[in-house]
Amino acid sequence: PLRPGTEKHTFPFPAEFCNLPADLGPCKNYTGRFYYDSASNKCEVFIYGGCPGNANNFKTREECRKTCVEICILPAELGPCDEYTGRFYYDSASNKCEVFIYGGCQGNANNFKTRDECRKTCVEICILPAELGPCDEYTGRLLLRLGIKQM
């Protein structure tokens, strides 16, 4: 149930919509907007037609940056509702995706349905542990080991 004065999100969490491509939309009232480019991890300018499009659309670079770029440093946030469910958030202190209890509405963007989604969004590839994988072919690979100054 919703607590008085709260409302459910009617759009996906930023972690989901920040990965959508820039969308001009069908209208022709062209204006400059910003979208989050997940490939470059930056907020970029795009031309918006003025209607529909998608939720990866911000009036200012700052709004885009606060919504999409910095989500991984936000704390876990329960939110004001009472529909408790397990979710994952990125804990920047431990550099891991951890479980937390989410109330079902509001909260913040550091909120992922799966650990894998959290890792893809927040964990830097160079701090992931080496994984051998399920196959039995032996192929040489390089591994970056942080804190070791050897070549």
Curated annotation (Swiss-Prot):
Expressed by the venom gland. It is found in: Secreted. The record marks K28, N29 as: Reactive bond for trypsin. GO terms for molecular function: serine-type endopeptidase inhibitor activity. Keywords: Disulfide bond, Glycoprotein, Protease inhibitor, Repeat, Secreted, Serine protease inhibitor. Residues 18-68, 72-122 form the BPTI/Kunitz inhibitor domain. Disulfide bonds join C18-C68, C27-C51, C43-C64, C72-C122, C81-C105, C97-C118. Belongs to the venom Kunitz-type family. Serine protease inhibitor. This is Kunitz-type serine protease inhibitor bitisilin-3.
